[in-house]
Amino acid sequence: MSFDEIAPDAKKVAIYGKGGIGKSTTTQNTAAALAYFFDKKVMIHGCDPKADSTRMILHGKPQDTVMDVLREEGEEAVTLEKVRKIGFKDILCVESGGPEPGVGCAGRGVITAVDMMRELEGYPDDLDNLFFDVLGDVVCGGFAMPLRDGLAQEIYIVTSGEMMALYAANNIAKGILKYAEQSGVRLGGIICNARNVDGEKELMDEFCDKLGTKLIHYVPRDNIVQKAEFNKMTVIEFDPECNQAKEYRTLAKNIDENDELVKPTPMTMDELEELVVKYGLIDL
């Protein structure tokens, strides 16, 4: 399997990040910006068991996940009409879903869902942008599928100037490096979803430098993101003229035009610790 086998002309991107970092919010607003401002044909495939990767694009409508339909109705019931929905600006939306709590492996669900979508030819040939929104706390076999099997050409990691977010980002970089030769996958850059901690921009610049990549965009914190989510919309749909919409527009443009893809140089735990101590995140 290579990334040329699905949606051959699309820019195929996987967005990784630890749970709660704002990865799905970032993915949906980026996808919405590409569709709204640049008239791109976009699809999001959510690879997070929370199945919230497309919620705002679909205005909060419940999404039948591939794994839910498979478990409850059987393989024959998994059709594009049932599991692939159309949202804001005709963005196509699919959620892998996961197992029942306490039973089975969510990573395995990602593998199954992607395989079924390929069989159903669920990734249209005329896509401009295809996003995989992937849980990044653990880069296990299933969640590493976009890396390992070359589903995505380039990976972007959402992080912030906080210890555990940086730890997860560094681990994801290790996963990218592991599969770089096998699948051709590369790191496109780091997206900082700002938490407004002291020295955050400087910390992110140095973190990117250590990984051998670049800060693709520093997304400032803004309460309009929560207001839009409360109204079950992306910021782009809620208020396309606001400052935060312009930030997401810039992020979308930076990703779409980026061709500086690298094999990352992950830090050792000692190096990461030194970095966060330098910026006062932890005391030793």
From Swiss-Prot:
Cofactor note as given: Binds 1 [4Fe-4S] cluster per dimer.
Record PTM: The reversible ADP-ribosylation of Arg-108 inactivates the nitrogenase reductase and regulates nitrogenase activity.
GO BP: any one term: nitrogen fixation
Domain of life: Archaea
InterPro entries (UniProt xref): NifH/chlL_CS, NifH/frxC, Nitrogenase_Fe_NifH, P-loop_NTPase
Positions of ATP binding: 17-24
Its EC number(s): 1.18.6.1
Modified residues (ADP-ribosylarginine): 108
Enzyme class, UniProt record, top EC level: oxidoreductase
Catalytic function, reaction form: N2 + 8 reduced [2Fe-2S]-[ferredoxin] + 16 ATP + 16 H2O = H2 + 8 oxidized [2Fe-2S]-[ferredoxin] + 2 NH4(+) + 16 ADP + 16 phosphate + 6 H(+)
Keyword Cell wall biogenesis/degradation belongs to the record: no
Swiss-Prot/TrEMBL keywords: 4Fe-4S, ADP-ribosylation, ATP-binding, Iron, Iron-sulfur, Metal-binding, Nitrogen fixation, Nucleotide-binding, Oxidoreductase
Binding-site residues, [4Fe-4S] cluster: 105, 140
Role description: The key enzymatic reactions in nitrogen fixation are catalyzed by the nitrogenase complex, which has 2 components: the iron protein and the molybdenum-iron protein.
Binding partners and assembly: Homodimer.
PANTHER family found in the cross-reference section: LIGHT-INDEPENDENT PROTOCHLOROPHYLLIDE REDUCTASE IRON-SULFUR ATP-BINDING PROTEIN
Family note: Belongs to the NifH/BchL/ChlL family.
Protein name, entry field: Nitrogenase iron protein 1
